[in-house]
Amino acid sequence: MAPKTTLIAEPELVSKSVNTIRFLAIDAVEKAKSGHPGMPMGCAPMGHVLYDEFMRFNPKNPYWFNRDRFVLSAGHGCMLQYALLHLSGYDSVKEEDLKSLRQWGSRTPAHPENFETPGVEVTTGPLGQGIASAVGLAVAEKHLAARYNKPGFEIVDHYTYVILGDGCQMEGVSNEACSLAAHWGLGKLIALYDDNHITIDGDTDVAFTEDVDKRFDALGWHVIWVKNGNDGCDEIRAAIEEAKSVKDRPTMIKVTTTIGYGAPSKANTYGVHGNALGPKEAEATRKNLGWPYEPFHVPDDVKKHWSRHIAEGAALESAWNAKFAEFQKKFPEEAADLKSIITGELPTNWESIFPTYTPENPGLPTRTLSHQILNGLGDVLPGLLGGSADLTLSNMAFLKNSGDFQKKSPGERNVKFGAREHAMGSICNGLALHSPGLLPYCATYFVFTDYMRAAMRISALSKARVLYIMTHDSIGLGEDGPTHQPVEHLASFRAMPNILTLRPADGNETAGAYRAAVQNGERPSILVLARQKLPQLPGTSIEGVSKGGYVISDNSRGGNSKPDVILIGTGSELEIAARAGDELRKEGKKVRVVSLVCWELFAEQSEKYRETVLPSGVTARVSVEAGSTFGWERFIGPKGKAVGIDRFGASAPAERLFKEFGITVEAVVAAAKEIC
């Protein structure tokens, strides 16, 4: 792609532009009476050089596919990004938006949120998440470029820029992700490290004395040090130009800055990190930096200089659209695939890949069924890619017809994350938020979601369609014992907003779970899968899963009859509920068996539908699930019984564990007899 037409302002105008950014941050935080002014004040030169001189974007179409991506990993410094979006001409950040920083219903929340503010690529705030998500954005660019670019057609060609701080560097997720970034040779990932040596607890000397340069050199990054980040725009510019010349590895530019630069008494102190300057210090800063303007004022010459980005951005997108039109004519199949990734449009008849299972089919673990369906989807969804945290064969989460995404084979679709669960989740967030039609999946044992929960929460908050394939879902994994046996995990994820927790029982339900995950484009999904072999049950269906809960058998239907008891199960325990129902029916009981495969989807159904599944007139209800009983009272009511596990597991064969913990047909039958 041709370089951006760069108009470097005269030094005096550059200085005025940088101070405009600083004072927009100061003024917004003052008005909000809370916030983080120090980081934007110190990083304003970085922001100016990046947005004004290097980044390619169209302010009037924040979602133009081939734009450069920017991630503010130090998300508390959000006013840096909001000021840059405002100056660049984004409609999402007008003056009134700056004035409503951190207020109810504003487009300028306390930390950048991709779903609130067009121009923000990923949600940041928890330190380290931003740089890790940025690795995902850079993976997306490298992968799509390898698959779709042709000689003369560099359709996918953009950079990912990040600003991160000392806190991000301390978080383990950043090191996990940066290790992978170097391993994969992400040459279009450029990170600028705000080296200001201040944390909330004081100087970084209290807890952070490592040599960051040497660490990143050891990881395999190209490292540059800009010693004067306070007003050294020329040095920052030269560093970014050098970084762009390095094609085979990511670059970390350490930029030494002064937090709160320009504030006479608060600069270089932790007091300017997370507090407004206060009226006196704000006024003193105006005098110190020679800023005579009223709050929120953008000088005319600064406004005029930045206004060119609107026309330049439109021209960049127009040129790309023309090139893509040529690409479509010459490479129609590749263009169609790429267009589906850009738009998120699902191909016609994509659901035809889902098999239908009957009780005559052999029983299989749901992780094996997942593998079959995942590969079927891989054949029809060009944006599907992902992998496992060093458990590929155990999770069975790989595409048979693809090789491994590596530095020298970036067009392949199997991603080996190594034992880095946290970074895996964050990288998948970046992949999902790069393009609507990218569908990243990642896999590990369900219990190890403890290592990646922060990333999964960001998935849910960001409306990122990430597919979490979580196997070994209960004591059913057997001898590995309580460290590997999830107990509380289902309950914890069911409590998390905007994420689907799907625990299928057999082939039909596994297919239904994948269908729901693909169709829900604005939330992640967790497929909770069993290691042990499970039968194909009568009465299960793909369509039933879409409703979250449904009846798989009932011998009371007809006339005004109603069941004596309702048995509710999920996953591997749905078979136990079904068999318990058969036993009770032999004794003359009218029994309904319900699969509650996804609580979230069931809660979204109409009250009328939910009543057809769990009629309020039937209070005798028993749930069975090999996990915590927490939350089941919502469905079984005050008169119901919950069969589950409210302690940690143990090391023994699975069959013995189910017996010892009372997750059996006999236990369900006994519980039912107590209440009906």
Curated annotation (Swiss-Prot):
The keyword Metal-binding applies. Mg(2+) binds at residues 166, 196, 198. InterPro entries: THDP-binding (IPR029061), Transketo_C/PFOR_II (IPR009014), Transketolase-like_C_2 (IPR055152), Transketolase-like_Pyr-bd (IPR005475), Transketolase_bac-like (IPR005478), Transketolase_BS (IPR020826), Transketolase_CS (IPR049557), Transketolase_fam (IPR033247). GO terms for biological process: pentose-phosphate shunt. Keywords: Calcium, Magnesium, Metal-binding, Thiamine pyrophosphate, Transferase. Leaves and roots. CDD domains: TPP_PYR_DXS_TK_like (cd07033), TPP_TK (cd02012). It catalyses: D-sedoheptulose 7-phosphate + D-glyceraldehyde 3-phosphate = aldehydo-D-ribose 5-phosphate + D-xylulose 5-phosphate. The active site is at residue 421. Substrate binds at residues 36, 273, 367, 394, 472, 480, 531. GO terms for molecular function: metal ion binding; transketolase activity. GO terms for cellular component: cytosol. Binds 1 Mg(2+) ion per subunit. Can also utilize other divalent metal cations, such as Ca(2+), Mn(2+) and Co(2+). Binds 1 thiamine pyrophosphate per subunit. Its EC number is 2.2.1.1. The record marks 36, 273 as: Important for catalytic activity. Thiamine diphosphate binds at residues 76, 125-127, 167, 196, 273, 421, 448. Belongs to the transketolase family. NCBIfam families: tktlase_bact. This is Transketolase 7. It comes from Craterostigma plantagineum (Blue gem). The lineage of its organism: Eukaryota, Viridiplantae, Streptophyta, Embryophyta, Tracheophyta. The gene is TKT7.
